[in-house]
């Protein structure tokens, strides 16, 4: 006996018209229901999966009994756990709950900017022995097919399920037993992701102006129930900041006090948990650069992990598993250098490690990594070799005028002239004669030439 999803099996016969798939239909009911559904429009059945005939002619449609599952996030795998993934269908026992999900690659469309955009695929369920892969055994490795079955089903025999006739049977909304985990990045068609008012608003102009139709047509224009608004998060944040006495419109500035707090918070952490940044530099976290700490130079010492070049170096850092299982470890007890005799003495240990990070030229960003490594490895040596010992500028003592120098060892340049030397000399007879003429009264010369 074949089973029909959505129909309870019954052994009772009837004198009505029985279709080929075993579903009882009365002729007047069938015609009436078709007229009600179409309302004068041509019936266009939805094709869920297609395959080409050997002759290469027409397209043979396969109709799933259930609504599809659509992907909405790229890169997500379609999969169910073992024993899960078969939709619930009244009238189908658990022994027949076996089949496969078929990936239907949808068409692409042209966007406003002229580019082609491919729609993400949609998956449909077919019982074992039906659909586009009816001839394949359960578990056959086929691209775009994911096999599922309940724990009570016999996967060695096809499911005794009739094919769906779209003219008489509508697709059943996909539902799963409790505990089923839906694949991440997928949603069930008709589960509420589409706009709920689109159907009522699109059908409203074609309905007769009855009371019921008016209420349905206006349902799309109703104001939504007060709920979450787009700016509700901003309002809540503003209320919280106002409660704390802060202004949300003013940008938060990093003051010396906040920088000191951040630095102290970092330094309170164990040495191996510190992350240097602008507020707490590399030397403040780990000390000066030297033979045992030979990485870092220039801006990277000031910025630490905030340096724009640091993230690409972080790709080389080992994981916790690689650190413990891929290194040579040695536990050593060291001297406690706390220096406070009042505090109880603690046993201090060091977990010393020795390992290597191996990479080659095929690594993404290899050239940049090599450049950054060459700039920062043993950079402290280049800084000491190229550093110039410039004496500090002498500071002027309070009350001392500019130009006064108290150091007698500083030599002063020789004056360039006698006037600059400011030395006294004896007057000659010619000088005395000139001085007398300057003292005589001035008389105007009236002689004619």
Swiss-Prot record:
MF annotations from Gene Ontology: RNA binding
Dimerization as annotated region, ranges: 266-385
Domain of life: Viruses
Region feature (Disordered): 1-55, 158-231, 266-297, 387-449
Comp. bias regions, Basic residues: 266-276
UniProt subunit comment: Homooligomer. Both monomeric and oligomeric forms interact with RNA. Interacts with protein M. Interacts with NSP3; this interaction serves to tether the genome to the newly translated replicase-transcriptase complex at a very early stage of infection.
The protein's name: Nucleoprotein
Lineage of origin: Viruses, Riboviria, Orthornavirae, Pisuviricota, Pisoniviricetes
């Amino acid at each position: 006996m074949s089973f029909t999803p959505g129909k309870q099996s019954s052994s009772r016969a009837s004198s009505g018209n029985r279709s080929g798939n075993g579903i009882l239909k009365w002729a007047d009911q069938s015609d009436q229901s078709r007229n009600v559904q179409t309302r004068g429009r041509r019936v266009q059945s939805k094709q869920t999966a297609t395959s080409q005939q050997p002759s290469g002619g027409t397209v043979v449609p396969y109709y799933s009994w259930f609504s599809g599952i659509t992907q909405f996030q790229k890169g997500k795998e379609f999969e169910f756990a073992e024993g899960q993934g078969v939709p619930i269908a009244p009238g189908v026992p658990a022994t027949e709950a076996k089949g496969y999900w078929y990936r239907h690659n949808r068409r692409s469309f042209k966007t406003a900017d002229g580019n082609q955009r491919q729609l993400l695929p949609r998956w449909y369920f077919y019982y074992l022995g039906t659909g586009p892969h009816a001839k394949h055994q359960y578990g056959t490795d086929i691209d775009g097919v994911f096999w599922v079955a309940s724990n009570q089903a016999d996967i060695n025999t096809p499911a005794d399920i009739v094919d769906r006739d779209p003219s008489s049977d509508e697709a059943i909304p996909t539902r799963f037993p409790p505990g089923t985990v839906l694949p991440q990045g997928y949603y069930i068609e008709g589960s509420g992701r589409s706009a709920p008012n689109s159907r009522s608003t699109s059908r409203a102009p074609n309905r007769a102006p009855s009371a019921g139709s008016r209420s349905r047509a206006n349902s799309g224009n109703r104001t939504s129930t007060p709920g979450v608004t787009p700016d509700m998060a901003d309002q809540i944040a503003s209320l919280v900041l106002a409660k704390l006495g802060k202004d949300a419109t003013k940008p938060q500035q990093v003051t010396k006090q906040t920088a000191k707090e951040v630095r102290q918070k970092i330094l309170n952490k164990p040495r191996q948990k510190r992350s240097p940044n602008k507020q707490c530099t590399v030397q403040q976290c780990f000390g000066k650069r030297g033979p045992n700490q030979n990485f870092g130079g220039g801006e990277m010492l000031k910025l630490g992990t905030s340096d724009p070049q640091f993230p690409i170096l972080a790709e080389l850092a080992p994981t916790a598993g690689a650190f413990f299982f891929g290194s040579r470890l040695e536990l050593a007890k060291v001297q406690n250098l706390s220096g406070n005799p009042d505090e109880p003495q603690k046993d201090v240990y060091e977990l010393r490690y020795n390992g290597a990070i191996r990479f080659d030229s095929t690594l993404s960003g290899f050239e940049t990594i090599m450049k950054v490594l060459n700039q920062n490895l043993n950079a402290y040596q280049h800084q000491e070799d190229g550093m110039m010992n410039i004496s500090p500028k002498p500071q002027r003592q309070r009350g001392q005028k500019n130009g006064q120098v108290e150091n007698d060892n500083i030599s002063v340049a020789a004056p360039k002239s006698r006037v600059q030397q400011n030395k006294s000399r004896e007057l000659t007879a010619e000088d005395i004669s000139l001085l007398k003429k300057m003292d005589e009264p001035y008389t105007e010369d009236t002689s004619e030439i």
